[in-house]
């Protein structure tokens, strides 16, 4: 069968496999590529090539992740798989690999285990919109009632963490069976991919969201005015658009009179572009690195929020000792560095290096924040943790 030419016409979705250790996440990832490769939709990836995940650095944290890509009849997928539990926690909290949805793998022989629960909670905290369940190792369970019981437990667990437990697709299969070419189990992998295609929503494209650009640098051009440079995070900006300048306590409105990229003048800039924006009536000292330019009324500066964070271990270059309530590190949000005070959850005395915890943060001045924003926690110039905002308080 001739391989289809890779067309970029299919919508792109980022997904991953999550779940308890040894429940078959990597085997399933290999099985998906193997089954789809037979249909000319993927390159075959062996278990070993996925399991020996390369190290990546994200916000100063080293994470092992494997990236696999494949397509279905409807979509193109980038799929991330992590070998170790700690890698998952770091990956999900730092957003090293953004997930638009995930396949949670649970062994029918064990049912939901502690990490199954932890990964579902993390997926909820970091706003993974939908999960699909793959019940693995069903070829090792003879009792149909046992399968029913595991499915019921999974639905209850999903509902407990505010996922749609009643309607989430649950596919009963065997990743190893599919990898070994057993037709019955290959069909289950195809069924899983159909469920992923229909249940996991297409993510909104960054260009379709409202305009936002964190300011990296500012300079003035004699006779023309002030230019703010940075990478556009979301949306599109046109010459003549009104914008708001937020952060550091001084909010101001202005109009973009020029968009420049690689020394060329453009009519517009869009998400992902590194641009310089010429701003009308703004003095060079009224705007500085760390501020945010955005569409008026979209986002507000806040100083207090809740966040899900991962604190680096000593071996990862993090702290050697725990920290206690009222710890005051630097928070690196977009292009802004700001001191903040951490309040620990009630009953938590201290946080050890390697912990994953929910904290409340109060910054010393308001900064443009939104739910889902990722940040690094730094101390003395090194990264000691990373996290993302789950709730804005003030």
From Swiss-Prot:
Q: Where is this region: G5?
A: 174-176
Q: Does the keyword Oxidoreductase apply?
A: no
- Which keywords accompany this UniProt record? Cytoplasm, Elongation factor, GTP-binding, Hydrolase, Magnesium, Metal-binding, Nucleotide-binding, Protein biosynthesis
The record's family statement is: Belongs to the TRAFAC class translation factor GTPase superfamily. Classic translation factor GTPase family. EF-Tu/EF-1A subfamily.
State one molecular function term (GO).
Answer: translation elongation factor activity
Question: What subcellular locations does the record give?
Answer: Cytoplasm
Role: GTP hydrolase that promotes the GTP-dependent binding of aminoacyl-tRNA to the A-site of ribosomes during protein biosynthesis.
Taxonomy of the source species: Bacteria, Pseudomonadati, Bacteroidota, Bacteroidia, Bacteroidales
- The protein depicted here goes by the name Elongation factor Tu
Q: Where is this region: G1?
A: 19-26
Note down the stretches annotated as region G4: 136-139
Known catalytic reactions: GTP + H2O = GDP + phosphate + H(+)
Region named G3: 81-84
**Binding annotation for Mg(2+):** 26
Q: Which InterPro entries match?
A: EF-Tu_GTP-bd, EF-Tu_GTPase, EFTu-like_2, EFTU_2, G_TR_CS, P-loop_NTPase, Small_GTP-bd, T_Tr_GTP-bd_dom
Residues bound to GTP are: 19-26, 81-85, 136-139
Q: What is its EC number?
A: 3.6.5.3
- Species name: Bacteroides fragilis (strain YCH46)
Could you name the Gene Ontology cellular component terms for this entry?
Answer: cytosol
Q: How does it assemble?
A: Monomer.
Domain named tr-type G: which ranges?
Answer: 10-205
Q: What is its main location?
A: cytoplasm
Outline the segment boundaries, as ranges, of region: G2: 60-64
Supply the Pfam families for this chain.
Answer: GTP_EFTU, GTP_EFTU_D2, GTP_EFTU_D3
């Amino acid at each position: 069968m001739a391989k289809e030419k890779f067309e970029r016409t299919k919508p792109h979705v980022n997904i991953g496999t999550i779940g308890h250790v040894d429940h078959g996440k990597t085997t399933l990832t290999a099985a998906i590529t193997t089954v789809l490769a037979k249909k000319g939709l993927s390159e075959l990836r062996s278990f070993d090539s996925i399991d020996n995940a390369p190290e990546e650095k994200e916000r100063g944290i080293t994470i092992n992740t494997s990236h696999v890509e494949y397509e279905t009849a409807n979509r193109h997928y980038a799929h991330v798989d992590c070998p170790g539990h700690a890698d998952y926690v770091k990956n999900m909290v730092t957003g090293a690999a953004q997930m638009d949805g995930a396949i949670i793998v649970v062994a029918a022989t064990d049912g939901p285990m502690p990490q199954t629960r932890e990964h579902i909670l993390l997926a909820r905290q970091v706003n993974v919109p939908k999960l699909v369940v793959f019940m693995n190792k069903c070829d090792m369970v003879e009792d149909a009632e046992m399968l029913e019981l595991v499915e019921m437990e999974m639905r209850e667990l999903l509902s407990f963490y505010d996922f749609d437990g009643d309607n989430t697709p649950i596919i009963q299969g065997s990743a190893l069976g599919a990898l070994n070419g057993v037709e019955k189990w290959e069909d289950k992998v195809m069924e899983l991919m159909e469920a992923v295609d229909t249940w996991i929503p297409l993510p909104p494209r960054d260009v379709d969201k409202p305009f936002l650009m964190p300011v990296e640098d500012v300079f003035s051009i004699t006779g023309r005015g002030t230019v703010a440079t940075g990478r556009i995070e979301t949306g599109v900006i046109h010459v003549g658009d009104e914008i708001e300048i937020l952060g550091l306590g001084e909010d101001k409105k202005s109009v973009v009179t020029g968009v420049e990229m690689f020394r060329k003048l453009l009519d517009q800039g869009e998400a992902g572009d590194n641009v310089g924006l010429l701003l009308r009536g703004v003095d060079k000292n009224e705007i500085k690195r760390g501020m945010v330019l955005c569409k008026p009324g979209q986002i507000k500066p806040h100083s207090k929020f809740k966040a899900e964070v991962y604190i680096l271990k000593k071996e990862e270059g993090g702290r050697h000792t725990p920290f206690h309530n009222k710890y005051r590190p630097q928070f690196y949000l977009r292009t802004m560095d700001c001191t903040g005070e951490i309040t620990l959850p009630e009953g938590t005395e201290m946080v050890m290096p390697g912990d994953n915890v929910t904290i409340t943060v109060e910054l010393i001045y308001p900064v443009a924040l939104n739910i889902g924003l990722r940040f690094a926690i730094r101390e003395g110039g090194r990264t000691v943790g990373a996290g993302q905002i789950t709730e804005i308080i003030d």
